[in-house]
Amino acid sequence: MKKFNIKSLTLLIVLLPLIVNANNIDSHLLEQNDIAKYVAQSDTVGSFFDRFSALLNYPIVVSKQAAKKRISGEFDLSNPEEMLEKLTLLVGLIWYKDGNALYIYDSGELISKVILLENISLNYLIQYLKDANLYDHRYPIRGNISDKTFYISGPPALVELVANTATLLDKQVSSIGTDKVNFGVIKLKNTFVSDRTYNMRGEDIVIPGVATVVERLLNNGKALSNRQAQNDPMPPFNITQKVSEDSNDFSFSSVTNSSILEDVSLIAYPETNSILVKGNDQQIQIIRDIITQLDVAKRHIELSLWIIDIDKSELNNLGVNWQGTASFGDSFGASFNMSSSASISTLDGNKFIASVMALNQKKKANVVSRPVILTQENIPAIFDNNRTFYVSLVGERNSSLEHVTYGTLINVIPRFSSRGQIEMSLTIEDGTGNSQSNYNYNNENTSVLPEVGRTKISTIARVPQGKSLLIGGYTHETNSNEIVSIPFLSSIPVIGNVFKYKTSNISNIVRVFLIQPREIKESSYYNTAEYKSLISEREIQKTTQIIPSETTLLEDEKSLVSYLNY
C-alpha cells in the first residue's frame, strides 16, 4: 500500500508541470475531427494573422491602421484562403498578394490613381501584369484600350506596384536603341498566327491571321505577295519591303515617323503559334504592342440550327404571322420584324420546338436536320448539306465535265452587341432538285438536265439572350404517295392486292429555320465524369422499375442535373 502511494505521488509530480503548461497555451488551436480551429479572444489583427501565417505560406504585412482592430470568434483554419476572404469582408479589411507577401490594410486606406502612358499601350501593360501573376481581378485597371490613360483603385501595395511597373516599361521603350539589330519571338494565346481557309461551295474563304494583318499594316494595306495570294492556309511571311516615306497612315501614338518601321521582317511559325520579328529593339516593341492588342480572348457561342418543314395550314393554326405576332396558346406571344421584305422573328425557341414536336406526331411537321455548332464571336460557322450532279459537255473537238451543287447551306457569323445581345450575319441558301437519277436523252442525243431551284436569304439580325431566331416561311409543294392496306387480309397471296389501294396527297409545306444562339461560359462547363455514377444508377433503376416519364425534354444544364438526380 505504501509502495502504491509513493508511485502515484511520483507520477503526479512528473505530470503536474505538463498540465499547467497545457492550460497556458496561447495558440488556442484545437483539433476537432481533423479540422483545425482557432479561437480568438479580442486579438489584434496583427497578432491574429501572425498565429497562422505559416498556413497561408506567405509572410503577412499588416498596416498600422489595420493592426488597431480586434477580432473575436472561432475560425476554421482548414481552408485559409476562404477564411481570409470571409474575415476581411466582415472586419472591413482589404488585402493584396504579390506572390512574395500578403499585405493587409484597413478599408479606409484604399487609394486611387490616374496614370498616363506615353510609349506602351494599356493592353500591353495588363498582359504584362497577368503574365507576371501580379494582376488582381478584384481591382481591375479601368480605361479605354485604345487610350493611354487608365485608372486604378485598390490597396496601396497594388496601386504602387502598377504605377511603378507602368513607369518602368514606359522608360524601357523610350530608351530602346534604334541601331542594333535584334530578334524577338511573340507568342499568341487567343488567336491564330496563320491564315485559315474555309471552302464553301467551291469558294475559298480566307480568315487572315495576325501575321497577315500586321504585314498588311506595315505595307500600308497593299496587295499581298504572290506566294500569299495562293490562299495557303499556313503561309510564311517575310517582310523586306520598305515602307513608303511619304505615307502617314500609321495609327501608333508612339510612332512619330513612318521610317521607324523600315526593314522589319516577320515570319509566322504555326507550330508554336508565334511570330518571329527581326529589327531593332524599338521596332520589335512596336510590333509586340500591336499584336498584344490584336490577341484578345473571344467568347464562345453555341448555335443550334433547326431545319423544319411544317404544313402550311398547321403553321397558320400556330399563329405565325411574319409581319405581326405569333401566339402559342394563351401564355406565350412574340413580336416580329415588321419589315415587309423580311421573314424574321425572335421567339422562345423551346416553346416553338415543343409545338413542332406535337405536330410531328401527327405527321404535320418534320425536323429535317438539327446540327449543333460551337464557334467563337466574329468567326463564321458553316453548315452545308449538299448534293452534286455532273454533266458532260461534249463539243466537236473537246469535252469537259461540269458539276452543279445544290442543297442547304447556312453561314452564320455571330458577335456580341454592346448590350450583350447576339448579333448574327446570316446567309441561308436552300436548293432542291427533281428526283431524276439518270439523265434522259431526246431524239438529238442531248441530255435533259434536272431542274434545280434555289432560295437564298441574307440578313443581319440581333437576338436577345435566351431567345431564338426564326427565319423562312417560303412555301413549296410536295407530292406523297402512300399505300394503304387492311391488316392480315392484304397479306393473303394473289387476292391480297384487292385489299390495298394507293393514295396521293399534294400539300403545301413551309420550310423554316430556327437558330438558337447561346453563349458558353466557363460556369457552363460540366465534367461528365461526375455524372458517370449517376448515369449508372439510373440505368440500374430502369432495369428494376418503370420510370413514369421516359420522354424528357432537357432545356438546359440545370434540367440535365435534375434528370440525373431523378
From Swiss-Prot:
Family affiliation: Belongs to the bacterial secretin family. T3SS SctC subfamily.
Function, as annotated: Component of the type III secretion system (T3SS), also called injectisome, which is used to inject bacterial effector proteins into eukaryotic host cells. Forms a ring-shaped multimeric structure with an apparent central pore in the outer membrane.
Protein name: Type 3 secretion system secretin
Domain of life: Bacteria
NCBIfam families found in the cross-reference section: type_III_yscC
Alphabetical UniProt keywords: Cell outer membrane, Membrane, Plasmid, Protein transport, Signal, Translocation, Transport, Virulence
Compartments it resides in: Cell outer membrane
Quaternary assembly: The core secretion machinery of the T3SS is composed of approximately 20 different proteins, including cytoplasmic components, a base, an export apparatus and a needle. This subunit is part of the base, which anchors the injectisome in the bacterial cell envelope. Forms a stable homooligomeric complex.
PANTHER family: PROBABLE GENERAL SECRETION PATHWAY PROTEIN D, SPI-1 TYPE 3 SECRETION SYSTEM SECRETIN
Signal peptide region: 1-22
GO annotation terms (biological process): protein secretion by the type III secretion system
Cellular compartments per GO CC: cell outer membrane; type II protein secretion system complex; type III protein secretion system complex
Encoding gene, per UniProt annotation: sctC
